[in-house]
Structure formats: C-alpha cells, structure tokens
Amino acid sequence: MTANLVAVCFAAGEPLRLARFWAGVLGGELTGGGRDVVVLVPRGETGFGVRFVSGSGPKLGQNQMHFDLTSVSPADQRATVAKSLGLGARHIDIGQRPEEGHVVLADPEGNEFCVIEPGNAFLEGCGFLGAVACDGSREVGLFWRAALGWPLVWDQDEETAIQAPGGGPKITWGGSPVNARAGKNRLRFELSPGAGRDQEGEVERLVALGAGRVEGDRGVAGPVVLADPDGNEFCVLAEGVAGS
C-alpha cells in the first residue's frame, strides 16, 4: 500500500519550450492541455513521466534535484552532449573537478543535469535516464523508500538510493551536509495514492512517515502539497488525476 510516482515535475517559465528540449534529449511523446501544462509520456524503462507546468520564478541557486544521463561509450557521451547543446543546453561550472568524467550542463531554463561517463558501475543497467539525483539527507532517502515502497539499493556514508523493483532510474540522495534551499524548488515529485487508498488517506500515511503539509487541500480534484523531512515540496494528486 505505497504511493505511485507519477512524474517529476518542472516549474518552467516556458513549459512547452522546456518540454520540447527534454523530449529531444530523452525521446518520447509530448501530450498536454496547452502551453501551460505539457507532459513527456513515460517510456518503458523510466516508469514515470516528466511534467512541465507554468510557474517558475528567477533561479536563485542550484536545484535540489537533477537528471543523470548515462553513456555506453566515450563517443556516445560526446553525442549526448552535442545533441543537448544543439537543442539549447549550455556548459556550466558547479565546482566539478577536471579529472571527473561527467559533463555538467544546464537546460534552456538553467536546470542542471549531468551526462555521466561510460563505465559507471552504480548506474549500470538503469537506462539512458540513469538517476534522479537529489541533494538530501539519509533520513529523507529512508522516507522516500517507505513512501514509494522501492528497495534501498545503496546506504553508505549517509548516501542513499532507491530503485523501483522492476528497475529503471535510481533516485539518489547525497547525504549531509544538505545545501540550503534557495526559494521554492523548481523540480518536485508528483504521487498518486496507492491501491485501495484515497488522496486524504495517502496524505495521512505520508504525514505519519514524516512529511509535513505546506498547503491545504485545493478542492475535490486538486493536489495536496506536502514537504519531505528535508523540506522539499511534493504533491499527492487526487484519485484518477494524471497531473496537477
């Protein structure tokens, strides 16, 4: 009786433009109700969608969450970087060392992502979208293990990672110290209630696990916004609602 991860949601200044960028990088079909809400339909290896909604303000600091893309060869890594740059990405410096093999880029709205070097054993078998990498404590990693019911696949030196039982991207947390948040997060998780549970029942379960309410109910068909133990917002959708 655990929640389902429906999507990783980006708050964007131009949702359609950002969605087209990520569709070009990740592949997949775009759907949605207009320019303010666009969905990148999940692929089989991913299991969750990527949603783009209107609402991003000025970027005040490094995001708490980013995508790690994998490579099968040096040529493949270069091709992913070149393709991303051609679609509107740019190189950025977030303190990575010259000897590190991954390439750090930002999408057209400044959201960081990494193109990981080939041979990375931790992400082996995870698919092209290898991980959703988060800045967060061990406590929050254990919270999300319980929230989603995904097995804990890494738990060392305060770093944690979970992965769906059927495989796909890992969700990782880098451990303490956790960077101070700079305003409301641009990326967040969107959940739907588990089987046999309604929205309020799911909210109550998540609160019992350590989440806190940051906004009240938004009506019959609206999402409930919560915060995980590190203060990162996420939302629980109403039953039968595919996105907020």
Q: Which residues are covered by each model-predicted region?
A:
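Eukaryotic phosphotyrosine signaling hubs
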Residues: L5, Q62-F67, L129, K184-F189
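Vicinal oxygen chelate
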Residues: A3, A7-F10, F48-F52, V81, ...
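Short hydrophobic/aromatic beta-strand micro-patches
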Residues: A11, D68-V72, A133-D135, E190-G194
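Short, conserved charged micro-motifs
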Residues: L16-R20, P74-T80, E139-G141, G196-E202
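Hydrophobic, helix-prone linear segments
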Residues: M1-G47, R51-N63
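Intrinsically disordered, low-complexity segments enriched in Gly and acidic/Ser/Thr residues
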Residues: A180, R186, E190, G196-G201, ...
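Conserved, structured core segments of small domains
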Residues: V50-G55, L60, D68, V72-A75, ...
